[in-house]
Each structure stands twice: as structure tokens, then as C-alpha cells.
Amino acid sequence: MEYTEDADRRELLLHSAYDSDTVRALERPLLDKGVPLMRMAAQAAAHMAAGMLDDEDLALEDTSIVLLAGAGDNGGDGLFAAAALAQEGANVTAIAVGRSLHEAGFASFVRAGGKVLVLDPAADIPGCASGFSAGEAGERLQTAIAVARKSHLIIDAMTGIGIQGSLRGIPAALASALGLDGEAPDEPALPNRESSGDFPLVLAADTPSGVGVNDGSMPGPYIPATVTVTFGAMKPCAVLPPATFACGRIELFDFGFDIDDKDPDVEVVDNSFASDAVRLPRFEDSKYSRGVVGLVTGSQRYPGAAVLTTSAAARANTGMVRYLGPERAQNMVLTALPEAVIGKGHVQSWVVGSGVPEASVEDADGDMQRDTIAALLKHYTLGSEDENKDAYDMPPIVVDAGALDLLPERVPGQVVITPHAGEMAKLLNRFETAASTAEHADSHEPYTADDVRLNPLASAKRAHELTGATVLLKGAVTIVVDEDHVYASGSAPAWLGTAGAGDVLAGLTGALLAQQDDVATTAETVASAAYLHGLAAAIASESEQQGWQEPELIGREHRQRFMTLGHPIVAGDVAHAIPEAIADVIS
């Protein structure tokens, strides 16, 4: 029983993220009992720093370490950690980025022989210079940047979870010089976030400074970490894109928070979660009772999408797929999948739009696919003169690619939209314009694909608010949003970025939805589909690299550090690996 409880807690810790207010509430009972959380955090950070340097075959007494220390508790964590490292012989310089430093942490650091460089002329730090000129302030900033760049390790303890929005002032200047400014890291997708081996290494204390702690956004300059040691529980930035890519390898130190009855702000999908979406076959099952998927996908222009969507749906534990489309696509589907049934009939879910041209494409309506989809989507319309009173009783429907511009103004939650960043920007612009017109409000600033990529959670939530649909926003870490939940799935290797992969996801999603008895589980089912899609890609590519790598618990045995990168794949490989992925999660 002890092992089970421990395993359950580990599962909860490593797949749940809590916003800053929740984390503070979780800390409070422990602080009231006198639990020294700051000292515990500092010990974990110092241990991690020493380990990072040891991995590079560097002894502490031969290293130069720079601490970027803010004025708050995060800076205190860093100062106590830096003091411990200095006591072990490291050459440590603390760069004070604010007007004060945590009093006890600062005293401990000075006693250990650490050096302090103050950057703010208005700082009031005992024994340190202040009141210097603007010219000297600029020189000190350049000195700080130079010292940091020449160090072996930077410990980033500037802001922690307390800041909202982008960095300002001195922290922003340091982040701009030492890190990136409002763009996601562009690095090879190595397994387990392996370090490039370049110095300085960066250890983020709790969260990288400058990222959106609660929404995973990139609002401005930030410092990408080699390793993030996070305290107590994961924060949303550790699991949400693009901030998760700035965290590097994530190490979690368990404070013992009481999280059993706390709903996470973001839940990360894993095998156990995804297994609930797979309906196990019954002895009395027929092809109809196991779930039937109807697909209006592919076109004269893109017939291959019909093959990929039907192939994926058929291999994802359904009893039958029905295909509607032009003759060329029908023939290709039957050649690839003779089990497919051509024509209309009763279904438990629909998949529409994959491989169907948008309205802006020449001859988009030439094969009648768009007309068929528009007529079907009319049954899901809410909140207008075209409202269908039975919309909530309609089967779930996956609206992909070329069908997104046919989405009605308001739909129930069993309508699932699956855009990538570019498609999401177009959809948001269309619906924001309609909302502004209806409310006689000023027009909004147009969204771009980059806007969506830099703040995908806000984009997905806004799309849900505007449409009512369950939203799956594709990415290296895919986000699924409905009224009450945010799910993240990062099971896919980077090899999945290949033509037709979204078609496979659409078919797989429709298949899982067809297996459900209750549309209330739509978001969970869709998130499970994203996870299985990534897992199938990992199987097909023989890769252990993932968009999101599960953290390691400090004090537990670490997993294999170097993993398999794998090899390129095509979308059809992913579809054929779906049965093995399903077997993996249900076993």
C-alpha cells in the first residue's frame, strides 16, 4: 500500500500544474507550521547546481557562478543556494537586480564569502554602493553582463512566480542580453532536453525569469534555462508552450503539498489518462456497437487526406468507418482500406474538413465537399435564427482544416475544432470581427500565427469563448481547452512535423469520440487522442524525444539521461502505429 500511495503521489506531482495563487495557498499551512521552505528550496537548487557542474566534469572550486538575485523570496532561495555553493569553494557573484535583497539570504551569502554587484542606483543593500550616477549604472550593467557570460553557471532567481506580464527595467535588460526576447527557443529537439554543453549553463530557480508563469506565454525578454528546479509543484509554464521549451530539463522538489483534493490548472495527459478513452471490446460487440465514424474528408485536390483520416479512424478501435467524398478519393480509400464503407449511414461521430480546400482556394467547391460539410454543421448551430433545437443531441464532430471557415457562430461543446497556429489566427480574426460588429465595438488588432504561437493558451481559451467548441490547438505540446479544463499533451517527437499528420489526428480523434457514451467527456477524449497520436509517432519513429519531457523528482532515481533520437517518418507510418499505441496505454 505504501508503494501504491507513493506512486499515486508521484503521478499527481508530475502531471499536474498549479497557478501561482494556488501554490501560495498550498505553501501557507506548511509555513504556519514552521517548515523552512526557503531553506529546502535553496538546498535543492544548490544540489542541482553542483550536479550540473559535475556533469561537465567541473569541481566547484574551479567554477565561476553568477546569481541573478531579485528582491523577493525567489532571490532569497537563490542567495541561500549561492551561499552553500560558495562554502564549497565556488567563486560566486550575486548580481542584485532590484533595490534590496532578502535579508537573511544576503547575510548568509556574505558570510560564505560571496561577492555582490549592485545595479540599481537607488538600492539600499547593507555594505554595498548606492547613489551612483546613471553613467556608472550603465557601466555596472555591462560589467554584470560580461561577468555572467564568462561564468560556468548562471542561477536565475530574479522573479519566481510573483511577476505578471513582461520583465521591466534591469531584469529586462539582463534577460535581453543573456537570453531571448519574445520568441521561442530554436534548438534541435534532443531527447530529454540534453544540454549543448556550451557555457554558461543556466539553472532557473522555480521558473525561468520572463516567461508567463500562469499561461506559458512569452510576453517579452526571458532567460532560457538548461535546467529548471521547481519547488513544491509544477507551475503552468512548466507544461504549457512555448514557456515549457524555455525550462530545459525540469527537476521537481517535493515540499509535501496537500494536493490530493486540488484541481490542477493544467493537467498533462499520460498513459493512465488516455486509457480511459479507449473502449475495451465486449464479447457481444458488433461493428456497430464498437463505434462508427463518418468522414467527409479529402477532395479532388487533396484525395490523400481521405486515405489518412479513414486509415487512422479504422485503426483506432472502431467497428466501422463510413466515407463520403468525390469518386477519386473514394477509390483511393477503398484501395488502402477495403474495410471502409462508402456512403451515408448512422454514425457515432463525424470528422470533416481534412484535405478540403478553404473557400479562398480556387475550385474549393468543385467536388461538393464544402456543401456537404456546411449542411452537416448547420445541425450544430446555436444562438442564431438558424439555431437547431437538437444541436446538443448531435454526435460529436471534429472540424478540421478546410471546414474551420464553415464553423457556425456558436456551437455546443461536442464540436471539436483542431487548428494549427495559422488556422487559429484566421478563425479568431473571423469571430472577433463578428463579435465586434454585433457589439458595435472597436475592431480588434488582427491576430497572427506568431501571436498564437507565443500565447497558445490564451488563444485557445478565446476561441472557446467565442465559439463554444472544444478546442484542440496543435503544436509540439498540444493544448485542449473547454469550459472547465486545460489539458496538455507533449508525447510526440519532433519527427511528427510532417504533411498529413493533422489528418491522422483528426481521424484518430473522431474514432475515440465514437467510442464514448457521454459527450461531457469530450475534452478528455480529445486530449487522449492527441496523446495517442504523439505516442504512435514515437513508436513509428523509434524516438524517445518528446515535445514535453516528464520532470524528474529530486531525491529519486533518475532515468536514463541519453535517449534515442529516432528517424524520420511520414503520416501513414503514424496511422499504422496507432494499434500499438493503444495497446501500450491499455496495458
Predicted features and spans:
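Nucleotide and nucleotide-moiety/phosphate-recognizing core
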Residues: 46-160, 164-205, 380, 384-390, ...
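Short secondary-structure boundary/hinge segments and terminal tails
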Residues: 103, 126-127, 140, 213, ...
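Short gly/ser/thr-rich secondary-structure transition/capping motifs
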Residues: 121, 128-139, 209-213, 274-279, ...
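Compositionally biased, intrinsically disordered low-complexity regions
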Residues: 107-110, 116, 129, 133, ...
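Internal gly/pro-rich beta-alpha loop/helix module
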Residues: 153, 158-265
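Structural alpha-helical scaffold elements that stabilize or flank donor/cofactor-binding regions
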Residues: 146-147, 221, 463
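Small-residue (G/A/S/T)-rich helix-start motifs and N-terminal tracts that mark the onset
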Residues: 1-98, 225-227, 233-416, 421, ...
